[in-house]
Amino acid sequence: MEKMRVVLITLLLFIGAAVAEKAGNGKAANNPAEDASDGEHNLVEEAGGIGDAITPAEGKALISAYESARFKKFVTHCSSHVAQTCSGNDPLHASGRCHGINVPLGLSFCLFDSMEKCLGDHEAKLIDPNPGPMSAIPNSIQSQQLLIETVKFRTVLKTCTRVSAKFCLSAPNVDTSVLPACLGPSLNQCVYPAADAFTPGPPLELPPIIIMN
């Protein structure tokens, strides 16, 4: 009976995650630490910048809702890597959904896909929360907890890649040479906004773009 209860709860989680992703497509969550069902808002337009969207105090209070050591261990490393990849500075990986990085939607797709791949390379793979065959549903409490962690982190990551992409592409005089310097810190601050998890540096000063006639 207990096993059946776990299976049913897990199935509902799968379905709920899939519905939440479809309902929130193209938007950004009001706070990345909140549950996926809370809906999404455009943080950049409302707050004017990534630093105002999520304060360190808010992040520290809410971080326990979605933080997972399994993912956090590699996020900083992967953020730096995907920032290079998605800025077009890594020709070996500049393919597939990384095309169109000069627009927020294309850049956010690239950031999410590249982060997913990087985490997978470090054996911290994001499990796809979309419903699958009944035989594929985890049947243990441990698997259920892992699914919950993954769904929450996946939602946070989807939100933060959209926010970071729009924020960094809206910066003045942005080009591919300075884009990584914005994307890496912005993504880290959004995913883990607690003061002790990430300390932002001084405001980024972008060099002017010289147009040759």
Swiss-Prot record:
The keyword Signal applies. Residues 1-20 form the signal peptide. GO terms for biological process: nodulation. Induction: During nodulation in legume roots after Rhizobium infection. Keywords: Nodulation, Signal. InterPro entries: Nodulin. Coiled coil: none annotated. The keyword Signal applies. Belongs to the nodulin 20 family. This is Nodulin-27. It comes from Glycine max (Soybean).
